[in-house]
Regions:
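Membrane-interfacial helix termini and adjacent extracytoplasmic/periplasmic loops
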Residues: 18-22, 140-192, 226, 263-264
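N-terminal signal-anchor/first transmembrane alpha helix
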Residues: 2-53, 121-127
Length: 313
């Protein structure tokens, strides 16, 4: 029995177009990326450059209005003692949170990478990522209750007999305060809690790629555990540490909610941008402050790139 095969009509025009793009793959790739690149360039970079350009505008303190007269007064104002203290305060906190995140994240990441598998590894992944599923503001407000006077933290320390130690610690000028929720230590703990998962996961991924044969070879050659860690594990984990530090450093640097809810009085860069733009209406000064984290993060990215951070992302 004969079988009739239906053939779709040929489309010579479509064949020519596909053949043209086959012979010119670069053009096809360009057209494929043209839409996303235009969106990224116009919406993201366009709005960012517009904001930064306003940092050179003039703000009239008398009329509270912005005029498009170019000036460097806003940039020079960043180096005033009060504004300089804000930059140093923010940079110090970002560095402290990053260092503490590395210290806390490494043991957990090492255990997850070397000693867990199957359901146990899935449990640790969920445990690390679970706080990230909650609202950022909810977590910040929850910590204000935990650290408040007569809160859970103080109750716990009281039952451990450590309340006098806490009282003595809160009298220190740089980290202390009336309560944990109004102290620099409390602000540091909230930052550390919120951004710690962003350090654990990249470090764990870097340690996961560490071949067990290297550890065995190091032991066979007579290296002590401390030497193995220093000369084998740590160099291979540095890209993951650098990748995690990008998140912890930059996110702390630009945060304005935690400094507003927890800790002693004192502006951070994010608070200053919000205050200048929202409360005062001084958009040029807010834009000038926006330039500070951009420059700092760009310098930091250039530094961690040399450590292989982008290869570990």
């Amino acid at each position: 029995m004969a079988m009739n095969v239906l053939q779709s009509p040929s489309r010579p025009g479509l064949g020519k177009v596909s053949g043209f793009f086959w012979r010119n793959p670069g053009l096809g790739l360009f057209l494929l990326l043209l839409g996303p690149l235009m969106w990224f360039g116009i919406v993201y970079f366009g709005s960012l450059l517009t904001l930064l350009w306003q940092g050179f505008y003039t703000f009239d303190d008398f009329t509270m209005s912005v005029t498009p007269e170019l000036t460097l007064a806003n940039i020079r104002a960043l180096f005033n003692p009060a504004n300089y203290d804000i930059i140093v305060r923010t940079l110090t906190m970002a560095g402290a949170v990053t260092i503490a995140s590395v210290i806390l994240a490494f043991p957990m990441a090492w255990y997850m990478a070397r000693y867990t598998s199957g359901k146990m590894k899935a449990f640790f992944y969920i445990a690390v990522m679970l706080p990230m599923w909650a609202s950022y503001i909810v977590k910040a407000y929850a910590w204000t209750l935990l650290l408040a006077k007569d809160g859970v933290a103080q109750w716990f320390l009281h039952h451990l007999g450590l309340e006098p130690l806490l009282t003595a610690f809160l009298t220190l000028p740089a980290v202390g305060g009336n309560t944990l929720s109004t102290s620099g230590l409390g602000r540091f703990l909230v930052f550390l809690y919120i951004w710690l998962p962003f350090m654990i996961l990249p470090v764990q991924a870097a340690l996961e790629r560490l071949p067990p044969s290297l550890l065995q070879a190091s032991a066979d050659l007579g290296a002590r555990p401390r030497q193995t860690f220093r000369y084998v594990v740590l160099p291979l984990a540095i890209p993951g540490i650098a990748a995690g530090s990008i998140f912890t450093f930059s996110l702390t640097l630009g945060d304005f909610i935690v400094p507003q809810l927890v800790g002693p009085p004192g502006y951070f860069i994010g608070n200053m941008v919000y205050s200048q733009q929202g409360a005062i209406g001084n958009m040029p000064m807010a834009a000038a402050f926006t330039l500070v984290p951009i420059v700092l993060i760009a310098l930091y990215l250039a530094f961690v790139k040399r450590l292989g951070a982008f290869d570990a992302l």
